């Protein structure tokens, strides 16, 4: 919310450090953003939707903001590309019986993952949240109501979207939530990244997405 695990169509699995998948902006816009990256600032044309563009085979994808530009806001979409490592992440917006089998598969293969959960998922599935935490997975913040965060202009409103999930997680597990944040639908702007950093969050995008939100195409 599964990417490329066809059994699990309701959760988005994103693979960082994988081959590219085009999302959001057109390739021309991505190229323009990368060409302008010498300034070290995220270009205004990159704001709104997180987007990726293909390079040659075997090369990491190009985002509409570079790793260096994102890093100044504690934001990421790639890890160390010299290492053969992937990061499994799931955006969990609702539950239809697939999360437990995903956790079973991860446990079988001793594969840790990160689950970015929204408010209704965490409040309606406390047993799954506890299991994620107990089995060594990261539970990250995907906001309380899954809004277009790029339209949120104040720190107060931004904080409100994150604090509800934090509070639910602590109530369920007795622990503080890891401050990892994924913008719903990948919609963001530079001010959002600054707000997330001010609140102590790392923002995580993706380098490959399995398009499972089109359920009829699975």
Predicted regions and their residues:
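Short, solvent-exposed loop/turn segments at secondary-structure boundaries
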Residues: 150-155, 215-217
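N-terminal Sec-pathway targeting helices
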Residues: 2-16
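His/Asp/Glu-enriched short active-site or ligand-binding loop at hydrolase and phosphoryl-transfer sites
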Residues: 193-218
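Active-site beta->alpha N-cap acidic-glycine motif
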Residues: 52-150, 164-170, 177-178
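Extended hydrophobic secondary-structure segments that form protein cores and membrane-embedded regions
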Residues: 180-183
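Sec-dependent signal peptide cleavage junction
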Residues: 24-38
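Helix-enriched interaction subdomains in cytosolic or periplasmic regions
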Residues: 38-59
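Soluble catalytic domains of enzymes that build or remodel membrane lipids, polysaccharides, and related
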Residues: 159-164, 173, 194-195
């Amino acid at each position: 919310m599964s990417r490329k695990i066809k059994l699990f169509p309701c959760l988005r699995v994103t693979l960082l450090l994988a081959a590219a998948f085009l999302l959001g902006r057109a390739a021309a816009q991505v190229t323009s953003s990368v060409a302008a990256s010498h300034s070290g600032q995220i270009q205004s044309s990159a704001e709104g939707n997180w987007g990726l563009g293909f390079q040659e085979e075997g090369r990491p994808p190009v985002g509409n903001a570079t790793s260096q530009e994102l890093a100044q806001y504690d934001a990421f979409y790639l890890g160390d590309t010299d290492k053969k490592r992937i990061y499994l992440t799931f955006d969990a917006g609702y539950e239809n019986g697939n999360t437990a089998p995903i956790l079973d598969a991860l446990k079988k293969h001793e594969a840790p993952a990160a689950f970015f959960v929204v408010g209704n998922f965490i409040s309606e599935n406390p047993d799954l949240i506890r299991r994620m935490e107990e089995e060594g997975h990261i539970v990250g913040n995907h906001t309380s109501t899954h809004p277009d965060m790029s339209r949120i202009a104040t720190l107060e409103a931004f904080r409100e979207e994150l604090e509800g999930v934090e509070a639910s997680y602590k109530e369920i597990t007795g622990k503080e939530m890891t401050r990892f944040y994924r913008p719903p639908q990948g919609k963001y702007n530079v001010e959002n990244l600054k707000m997330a950093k001010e609140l102590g969050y790392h923002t995580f995008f993706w380098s490959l997405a399995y398009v499972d939100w089109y359920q009829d195409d699975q």
